Amino acid sequence: MNIIQKEKKNKKPLDIKKIKIGLTKSFSLKITEKLHNQFKIFSGDVSPIHNDIKFCKFNKFEKKLGYAFLITSALSKIYGVYFPGGNELCLHQSCNFKNPFYINDILLFKLKIVQVNQLTKIVSINTEVKSKKKIIFDGHSILKLSLKK
């Protein structure tokens, strides 16, 4: 899964004092046919809505739909490698799938820290994902920071 961002992986853990409410980060991910097929194999989801163009068109979709849970898989990588400091443990993730997305779409992830507890090292993050300027996903996560390796 090739998450595209300008910065490299976090090599050094962030100091908890640098993780502030309002801190935002953006990432993008292209949903390639290869990534789509890898997720199909991994998940075992062979539903025709994701894999049969005739079925999709009959149901008024222009193309095969992307797998919604590919978004949460990308979030797992973002939390574990990039943001807010890498090496986080996801304690909770809410998911609201608002609109479909398709193979070859580029998903734009915007994450914003909305709560930080420096004592417990727990942060809350709101996430919004867009494709072609449409919101396709929003959610809320609670992460336990594990800032030291």
Positions of PLM-derived features:
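HotDog/MaoC-like acyl-thioester-processing domains
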Residues: 1-24, 28, 101-149
